Amino acid sequence: SFPFADESFPFDDTALVFKVHGKMFALLSLDDQPARINLKNNPERNIELREEHDWIIPGYHSNKRHWNTVIVEEYASWELIKEMIETSYKLVWQKLPKKVREGSV
């Protein structure tokens, strides 16, 4: 769990959204098999990840420059997925206004 993160279903009952102070850092599709999760990353890193792993594709219904969709296959690297979730959270956290970040401590 991440500080000040919460989850909700703002779109429908199959898209679980994770936010920090109202800003999305992950979207998990619950009705897809295998599961899919959209995560934010740096544009250059997104390109690298897509080239290295066929289970990472441009973000579905997202800005494809900044977001990836991770297809959670059984052969997917759980360590990499955890790292990507953490990176997504940190990138969104860093974009929050300073007064929000400092008021959250």
Predicted regions located by residue number:
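Charge-dense, helix-prone N-terminal extensions
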Residues: 1-105
